[in-house]
């Protein structure tokens, strides 16, 4: 199947998913500089919030350097052609957060739930549509649901008013074939006018391949991050995706060389550590574990002497999902006790 001439919308994750490896401590100056670089490179949609979305600032997820309001207020007036989006997880973010984001000029709201819990998104999706926002239903940890279950959940979100649905590989666990079956099933079930997106992680080095597979199966919005800055081994690396799309004749509107410069000159220098597929990030993908668990598991390793890899495998075995970061500490303590590293 040729994709030559196909148009997609690339959605940048550097300033939202990239907050995870930065422990949510990105400065306003870093946000503004990178946002301007992305805007100048032609990226049409840029996500800006705490890594866990609007209202994510907490003991459980981490306290950011600045509030969502401050980050959004700093970035939105600066971008010339790009629109700004925000992520919202019901139960973390509220309708009041949504109103605040809309008031500041956020164009797109992405309402995220676990892939089998679309029903908790109804209030937020309906409210966002009432505000006439570009409203996205974001189904996380998509590897944990069958294609049939996923399309059922996607139709719920579409019914609430979402004009775009995302198949989200939060764990970086899917392979091109499993991406195609899920994205293809959802595409077939949705109305033709409802857009379809894919969000990948690079834990098995499949970010770009999976994104291309998603485009082949009918997705037209694709998430990526400059230099891959994101949870785990990072998001699909934007500069690589853009180069591959260019070679395949897929139109993105993003400048191949300018996005490379953003990645190399602006994003890599602010990394606290290299975003790469180390054994722990690889374990996330292999075991199908939520990407933002990585740093929590590494911290628990330091505290309890249980290897992060073992903790992550156990989290996968227990079927833990996004939002259960507090269980990492609990799991590490239990494992340390069982191994005689901690007094009972």
UniProtKB/Swiss-Prot annotation:
Record keywords, A-Z: Aromatic hydrocarbons catabolism, Lyase, Manganese, Metal-binding
Enzyme class: lyase
Keyword Protein biosynthesis: no
EC number: 4.1.3.39
Catalytic residues as annotated in Swiss-Prot or TrEMBL: 20
Catalyses which reaction(s): (S)-4-hydroxy-2-oxopentanoate = acetaldehyde + pyruvate
Binding site for Mn(2+): 17, 199, 201
GO biological process per UniProt: catabolic process; L-leucine biosynthetic process
Top-level taxonomic group: Bacteria
One of the record's GO molecular function terms: 4-hydroxy-2-oxovalerate aldolase activity
Domain Pyruvate carboxyltransferase, chain residue ranges per copy: 8-260
InterPro entries: 2-IPM_HCS-like (IPR050073), 4OH_2_O-val_aldolase (IPR017629), Aldolase_TIM (IPR013785), DmpG_comm (IPR012425), DRE_TIM_HOA (IPR035685), PYR_CT (IPR000891)
Swiss-Prot/TrEMBL site (Transition state stabilizer) positions: 16
Binding-site residues for substrate, renumbered to this chain: 16-17, 170, 199, 290
Annotated family: Belongs to the 4-hydroxy-2-oxovalerate aldolase family.
Protein's recorded name: 4-hydroxy-2-oxovalerate aldolase
Organism expressing this protein natively: Verminephrobacter eiseniae (strain EF01-2)
